[in-house]
Curated annotation (Swiss-Prot):
Keywords: Ribonucleoprotein, Ribosomal protein, RNA-binding, rRNA-binding. It comes from Bradyrhizobium diazoefficiens (strain JCM 10833 / BCRC 13528 / IAM 13628 / NBRC 14792 / USDA 110). Belongs to the bacterial ribosomal protein bL21 family. This is Large ribosomal subunit protein bL21. GO terms for cellular component: cytoplasm; ribonucleoprotein complex; ribosome.
Amino acid sequence: MFAVIKTGGRQYRVAPDDVLEVGKIEGEVGSIVQLNEVLVVGGDTPILGLPTVAGASVAVEVLDHKRGPKVIAFKKRRRKNSRRKRGYRDEITVLRVSEILTDNAKPTKGPRPKKEKVAKEATKEDAAA
């Protein structure tokens, strides 16, 4: 099953367990957020929305908030000794799709538990250094 969602003025084709980067969405890291602008729900019998599918939503887990790569906007007017250089970095939210819901259903899955980092065991080479 897949869905086409709209967020931040862009459209994304998503399936369960997909990880995607979108424009900033409010929500704490590790929380579940519902995206209600679902344009298409696909599967055995696809449902097209006009413009959105009624009662459909996508539950996503917020994995991280970060900043995107730097974008440079450089303008130059030739022979005029006029130039302007500006740059910016977008705020990005990293999401993992938990479930695709239809018929006003509530999300059944909660946030996934975080994996604990395993500490390296000291070896003879590390002790000698």
